[in-house]
A protein has these predicted regions:
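Alpha-helical tetratricopeptide repeat
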Residues: 1-573
Length: 573
């Protein structure tokens, strides 16, 4: 292969690359010694700079490493042959960054596949400390690396030519290049985390991975919309929480715990992983009291969650974890607020449930009528602009409403959340909408609550959580009755447009580069995620109220709360 013309060599490799991608389990080329051939090409690429920079040879290391990764993806036999052929040393050279981030991407992919099998993992584990450190660094800085070296270069003619050709396969302009670069950067991060998972799941390098700075980075790693099938950072955090030393390190990081708690109250597909992490930490008596103060505040809203995906009795498991030592006199809780929350959980899940078991159908129907009357009173107060009275009435209705009347309670919680939004109390709005979504069947399916929680999260500056709820709202909105062919609401489109910019994979890297540039020019920088104009521009989305006759009265009354004349009435009560 090394003796033929470089253009022919690249043509042959690109053909082998396609075959390996489309037929990764075909034994023909692995049996003919393709791995030894790839090893010789990789060694030449990493050790002979003048050779790799000669003409088309620059494409060789990418194709060679990609071919190794494709053939070892699903086959233990091929993985063992690759290791015996000596693929690990040259792949490590690529992982070290000897060439560029493009080659690091395919190197970490191939090493991740080799680490997936027990027999080949041991050979890689000889370099354990270096591999783990390199991979942690790559996972943390890949967004900055790709942004600074590729995406931030606005003139496509100034970008590295072979990077552009590999990323877009020769098609598309600046927009396509940026979109594919985001996808590749996200893959680098996800594949790096997969490689770290292979060590962590075997109980290896836990203390090394649990570096506090890396844990903070890990908690913010999100596969995003381009890699929605990857659990990303939370997947590795959950694996760490299955080990005693991992739980101890995780519990010591306030930022990580808050991130896990936020995930547990979101409509993210990985919500259950956040809940799992908190339950593991609460069941360990060495970490329980380090996280209970924060976790109880969030988990209180999830105690009635019945089913989440394939997981059943989720709320019951949460309740048991929170009340482990509440009534046996062994609790070490000294903080009044935590004690209040646990008492509230006990009253809701134990006392009230026990009392309602013997409630007759006639009594239940009587309660339903009374609750509906109170709800109507609250609605009238709301439309008259008396938000404080409306909150009091919704609260009264919730206290009276039996747990069995789930639909009524969903409406009461969601309507009270709307009131909290109007008085600028997003924390209470998130709490109430989460409770409504926990009661809904299936979980996280009540459209109005999704929209209201999306707004509340936006007000708190939590773009990712807001985006997830907004997307779920649109999904619920358009699937309610497909025959009606409802159009997606404009206000939801406006919300998503803003949130997509804030949750862009390179948003942090762009902000950091911009701040460094501003700092060097005038010494001023800003870390605010949202500007005041953005906040007010989105918060004041005007929606058409359902009850028009009170529209002007509502506008007049809402001015008391500092709202503009056209304050929105989001998904009206």
């Amino acid at each position: 292969m090394l003796s033929i013309d470089e253009q022919q060599r690249v043509l042959i490799l690109s053909t082998l690359w396609k075959i390996a991608m489309n037929q990764p389990e075909d034994p023909e080329f692995p049996s003919l010694g393709i791995f030894k051939c790839m090893v010789s090409l990789l060694h030449k690429s990493t050790n002979d700079k003048s050779w790799v920079l000669d003409g088309q040879n620059i494409y060789i290391p990418y194709y060679a490493a990609h071919i190794v990764g494709s053939y070892t993806m699903n086959s233990l036999d091929f993985a063992e042959k690759a290791v015996e052929s000596g693929v690990i040393p040259p792949l490590l050279d690529l992982l070290r960054g000897k060439i560029s981030w493009v080659e690091q991407r395919v190197a970490v992919r191939a090493l991740g596949h080799l680490a997936s099998y027990d027999s080949t993992f041991e050979t890689l584990a000889v370099h354990e400390e270096e591999v783990v450190k390199l991979t942690m660094g790559l996972a943390s800085r890949c967004s900055e690396l790709v942004y600074n070296e590729f995406v931030s270069v606005k003139d496509t003619n100034l970008r590295v030519n072979y990077h552009k050709n590999l990323i877009t396969r020769g098609f598309g302009g600046l927009e396509m290049e940026n979109r594919k670069a985001e996808e590749w950067a996200s893959q680098i991060q996800c594949w790096s985390l997969h490689l770290l998972n292979c060590f962590a799941v075997r109980g290896r390098s836990i203390d090394l991975i649990c570096n506090q700075d890396f844990l903070k980075d890990l908690s913010s790693m999100w596969g995003g919309l381009v890699n929605h099938t990857s659990p990303s950072g939370i997947g590795l955090i959950r694996i760490l929480c299955y080990t005693q030393s991992g739980r101890r390190k995780v519990s010591e990081s306030k930022e990580v715990i808050e991130c896990i708690c936020n995930l547990s109250r979101s409509s993210d597909a990985w919500q259950y992983m956040g809940i799992d992490c908190l339950l593991l930490l609460l069941h360990d008596m060495d970490t329980r009291y380090k996280v209970l103060e924060v976790a109880s505040f969030y988990l209180l809203d999830l105690i009635e969650l019945r089913k989440l995906g394939e997981r059943s009795k989720v709320g019951q498991k949460i309740t048991k974890a929170l009340l482990i030592d509440f009534k046996n006199g062994k609790s070490r809780i000294k903080i009044p607020e935590i004690d209040r929350i646990l008492k509230q959980i006990w009253v809701t899940k134990v006392d009230k449930k026990r009392r309602e078991r013997s409630m007759s159908d006639e009594k239940l129907e009587e309660k339903r009528v009374m609750v509906n009357l109170i709800k109507q009173q609250a609605n009238n107060s709301f439309w008259l602009g008396d938000i404080e009275t409306a909150v009091e009435k919704y609260t009264e209705g919730l206290k009276l409403c039996p747990l069995k009347l789930r639909k009524e309670r969903i409406v009461l919680y969601s309507n009270r959340a709307q009131c909290y939004l109007l008085v600028n109390d997003p924390d209470s709005a998130v709490s109430d909408t989460t409770r409504a979504l926990s009661i809904s069947k299936p979980a996280n399916s009540h459209a109005k609550s999704l929209w209201r929680r999306s707004q509340a999260y936006y007000m708190k500056g939590m773009a990712k959580e807001s985006l997830m709820d907004c997307l779920m709202f649109i999904n619920a909105f358009v699937t309610v009755d497909k025959r009606k062919q409802e159009k997606i609401p404009y206000y939801a489109v406006q919300m998503i447009r803003k949130l997509m910019d804030s949750t862009w994979f390179f948003a942090s890297a762009k902000s950091k580069l911009s701040n460094e540039s501003n700092s060097s020019s005038n010494g001023n920088s800003s870390n605010e995620e949202f500007t005041k104009d953005e906040m007010s521009g989105l918060y004041t989305i005007l929606e058409e109220p359902m009850i028009r006759k009170h529209k002007e009265a509502v506008k007049r009354k809402l001015n008391k709360y500092g709202k503009q004349k056209d304050s929105f009435m989001a998904l009206s009560i």
